[in-house]
Amino acid sequence: MKVSIIGAGMVGSSIAYATMIKGVAREISIVDINGDLAEGQALDLSHGAPYVHPVRIKGGNDYSLTKNSDVVVITAGRAQKPGETRLQLLKSNAKIISSIVESCLKYSENPIILMVSNPVDVLTWVAWKKSGLPRERIIGSGTTLDTARLRQNIADHCKLDPRSVHAYIIGEHGDSEIASWSTANVGGVPIKEFCNGCLAKGCERDKVFERIFENTRDAAYKIIEKKGATYYGIGLAVARILETIAGDHHSVLTVSSVHEEFRGMRDVPFSVPSVLGKKGIERILPLKLSDDELKGLENSAKVIKAAIESILENREPRAENPR
């Protein structure tokens, strides 16, 4: 599989590094407006190939490097300038994404486009509108990382292997995201039943759930406060998405996609558990949510829809989670 990564910053290079270690791609191209940076990242990574898996890595600022890509991963975008409104930034990044999609499609006929740039749900919609590709081939990294954070936080509290925890963050990758506690389980045991043993020891389950969710939702803010940016976690999350596409694994991941209809809203992107394979999103799983969770998901979808409409109507969107 050939993977092209647009954006050679810390997120893009972390994705390339994780993808290389997993042996997911036979060829990786890194493209950035700063051609020297992209070339340097590619050269640095290529020197580690003898210790992992055979892979050809190239970098530069020419989109011809993306020719015949199976998957195009987009991490590019720009930061907010002093005095710039969120709408101005969002519209600017939407133009950047549109330009990237147009450039990539000149060299690859029917790639899967994997959006990582934030706000990921809105920009997934932008890529879908610009590309003209089927919905199933436009994927956002969505809440894949948020879901991993939730599972790790549950595992830390319960002293478990996080791979044995099955819980999902759904909706927006941002402050309106929700945890689907009603579907969460440990080894097939519903999470609330699993926690019954702790209740006898004085554990206040609902307060623990609330704290775990808040730590999950606000994780990016804490990381950015400590080190300035997040990139390793999202690098591994995106490499996992690429792995299931390359191997046609039909794994279930909480990626973002543009839903044709949801509770009266058309063409709204958000994350729910989805089956991924070589064609992209093979199917979307119907979650049995509680009434409160369904209301939360509906609210999250409305938040995303409002951000999309703000681009079209020149209205100021609300803030979103940085990563």
UniProtKB/Swiss-Prot annotation:
<feature type="binding site">
    <location>
        <position position="230"/>
    </location>
    <ligand>
        <name>substrate</name>
    </ligand>
</feature>
<dbReference type="Pfam" id="PF00056">
    <property type="entry name" value="Ldh_1_N"/>
</dbReference>
<keyword id="KW-0560">Oxidoreductase</keyword>
<feature type="binding site">
    <location>
        <position position="11"/>
    </location>
    <ligand>
        <name>NAD(+)</name>
    </ligand>
</feature>
<dbReference type="InterPro" id="IPR011304">
    <property type="entry name" value="L-lactate_DH"/>
</dbReference>
<comment type="function">
    <text>Catalyzes the conversion of lactate to pyruvate.</text>
</comment>
<feature type="binding site">
    <location>
        <position position="80"/>
    </location>
    <ligand>
        <name>substrate</name>
    </ligand>
</feature>
<comment type="pathway">
    <text>Fermentation; pyruvate fermentation to lactate; (S)-lactate from pyruvate: step 1/1.</text>
</comment>
<dbReference type="GO" id="GO:0004459">
    <property type="term" value="F:L-lactate dehydrogenase activity"/>
</dbReference>
<feature type="binding site">
    <location>
        <position position="86"/>
    </location>
    <ligand>
        <name>substrate</name>
    </ligand>
</feature>
<feature type="binding site">
    <location>
        <begin position="118"/>
        <end position="121"/>
    </location>
    <ligand>
        <name>substrate</name>
    </ligand>
</feature>
<feature type="binding site">
    <location>
        <position position="141"/>
    </location>
    <ligand>
        <name>NAD(+)</name>
    </ligand>
</feature>
<feature type="binding site">
    <location>
        <position position="151"/>
    </location>
    <ligand>
        <name>beta-D-fructose 1,6-bisphosphate</name>
    </ligand>
</feature>
<feature type="binding site">
    <location>
        <position position="32"/>
    </location>
    <ligand>
        <name>NAD(+)</name>
    </ligand>
</feature>
<comment type="similarity">
    <text>Belongs to the LDH/MDH superfamily. LDH family.</text>
</comment>
<keyword id="KW-0520">NAD</keyword>
<protein>
    <recommendedName>
        <fullName>L-lactate dehydrogenase</fullName>
        <ecNumber>1.1.1.27</ecNumber>
    </recommendedName>
</protein>
<dbReference type="InterPro" id="IPR036291">
    <property type="entry name" value="NAD(P)-bd_dom_sf"/>
</dbReference>
<dbReference type="InterPro" id="IPR001557">
    <property type="entry name" value="L-lactate/malate_DH"/>
</dbReference>
<feature type="modified residue" description="Phosphotyrosine">
    <location>
        <position position="221"/>
    </location>
</feature>
<feature type="active site" description="Proton acceptor">
    <location>
        <position position="173"/>
    </location>
</feature>
<dbReference type="InterPro" id="IPR015955">
    <property type="entry name" value="Lactate_DH/Glyco_Ohase_4_C"/>
</dbReference>
<comment type="subunit">
    <text>Homotetramer.</text>
</comment>
<dbReference type="InterPro" id="IPR018177">
    <property type="entry name" value="L-lactate_DH_AS"/>
</dbReference>
<feature type="binding site">
    <location>
        <position position="99"/>
    </location>
    <ligand>
        <name>NAD(+)</name>
    </ligand>
</feature>
<feature type="binding site">
    <location>
        <begin position="116"/>
        <end position="118"/>
    </location>
    <ligand>
        <name>NAD(+)</name>
    </ligand>
</feature>
<keyword id="KW-0963">Cytoplasm</keyword>
<keyword id="KW-0597">Phosphoprotein</keyword>
<dbReference type="Pfam" id="PF02866">
    <property type="entry name" value="Ldh_1_C"/>
</dbReference>
<keyword id="KW-0021">Allosteric enzyme</keyword>
<dbReference type="GO" id="GO:0006096">
    <property type="term" value="P:glycolytic process"/>
</dbReference>
<dbReference type="InterPro" id="IPR022383">
    <property type="entry name" value="Lactate/malate_DH_C"/>
</dbReference>
<feature type="binding site">
    <location>
        <position position="166"/>
    </location>
    <ligand>
        <name>beta-D-fructose 1,6-bisphosphate</name>
    </ligand>
</feature>
<feature type="binding site">
    <location>
        <begin position="146"/>
        <end position="149"/>
    </location>
    <ligand>
        <name>substrate</name>
    </ligand>
</feature>
<dbReference type="InterPro" id="IPR001236">
    <property type="entry name" value="Lactate/malate_DH_N"/>
</dbReference>
<feature type="binding site">
    <location>
        <position position="63"/>
    </location>
    <ligand>
        <name>NAD(+)</name>
    </ligand>
</feature>
<dbReference type="GO" id="GO:0006089">
    <property type="term" value="P:lactate metabolic process"/>
</dbReference>
<dbReference type="GO" id="GO:0005737">
    <property type="term" value="C:cytoplasm"/>
</dbReference>
